[in-house]
Amino acid sequence: MAAPLIPVLTAPTAAGKTALALRLAREYGLEIVAADAFTVYRGLDLGTAKPTPQERASVPHHLLDVVDVTQSYDVAQYAAQAEAAIVDILARGRLPLVVGGTGFYLSALSRGLPLTPPSDPKMRAALEAELQERGLDALLAEIEQANPAEAARMERNPRRVVRALEVYRAAGRFPGEFGYSPPAFQYQVFAFSPPAAEMEQRVQERTAAMLRAGWPQEAQWLAGQVPPEQEPRPTVWQALGYAEALAVAQGRLSLAGAEQAIALATRQYGKRQLTWMRRQLGAEVQSPDAAEAHLRAFLERSGAPS
């Protein structure tokens, strides 16, 4: 019997995908497989808008809180664990719903992992030093000049930029040019985004609520676990808003200033997410209502109980 098509629900940060996913999961008896680069970390709760204990008690979730903030975690680990979770869910007669906005993770599942050469520690160290000396924009510009599509895949993530240049300088090709290992499953992507004005309001309100709920204190805790000044910059400190939240906790930035800075960064990231959905996932970005209707129709066809 052929493996079923696995549904994926994605949207920009703050668009409301978690609320929609929870509603559909309760209605159709789904289990949620998270696709978020930072909710995998234990302790990053408020700043990642991780589902609450009550929400997780009402719907089974996978790939949340799987690694400590002091540990490294990469896309290959994510893909292996997410695919194992999907196998387990299907074996129990349930249907998974992949939910998240981290394009790199979604691409790894739906397209497979790039067949790139192994890492070269010496080259990696040299590039990390170059990153500190020249800055992220200079290294990104080097990728952009050689392969604009590869540059778009980087999402301004320093680790991805370093890895891309490591592979390029060693082999003359970027990771995305090596082809991909076959994905374990086939996926149907349902992508949505509210109108721009609504998104702006949602981002602003969400940011303010997260800061009031204790995000600065969470960032202060994180700094005690993983100093943000470490070089290379720790992965957990690449999460949106944590640097600003820490600045609030340390009295270096006002709450209002942090709110504006984080909201701006979130809107900019949301635009990059939409670009990734269209270019890398091949998704049609619909209105929330249209995406929900299409996903419901998919679930009805799949035989998910309602």
UniProtKB/Swiss-Prot annotation:
Residues noted as binding ATP in the record, renumbered to the chain: A11, P12, T13, A14, A15, G16, K17, T18
Reactions this protein catalyses: adenosine(37) in tRNA + dimethylallyl diphosphate = N(6)-dimethylallyladenosine(37) in tRNA + diphosphate
Residues that, per the record, bind substrate: T13, A14, A15, G16, K17, T18
Key words of the record: ATP-binding, Magnesium, Nucleotide-binding, Transferase, tRNA processing
Listed InterPro entries: Dimethylallyltransferase, IPT, P-loop_NTPase
UniProt enzyme class: transferase
Residues of the site described as Interaction with substrate tRNA: T102, R124
GO molecular function: ATP binding; tRNA dimethylallyltransferase activity
Cofactors that this protein relies on: Mg(2+)
EC number: 2.5.1.75
GO biological process: tRNA modification
Classification via SUPFAM superfamilies: P-loop containing nucleoside triphosphate hydrolases
Protein origin, superkingdom: Bacteria
Similarity comment text for this entry: Belongs to the IPP transferase family.
Role summary: Catalyzes the transfer of a dimethylallyl group onto the adenine at position 37 in tRNAs that read codons beginning with uridine, leading to the formation of N6-(dimethylallyl)adenosine (i(6)A).
Quaternary structure annotation from Swiss-Prot or TrEMBL: Monomer.
Entry protein name: tRNA dimethylallyltransferase
Species of the source: Deinococcus radiodurans (strain ATCC 13939 / DSM 20539 / JCM 16871 / CCUG 27074 / LMG 4051 / NBRC 15346 / NCIMB 9279 / VKM B-1422 / R1)
Gene from which the chain derives: miaA
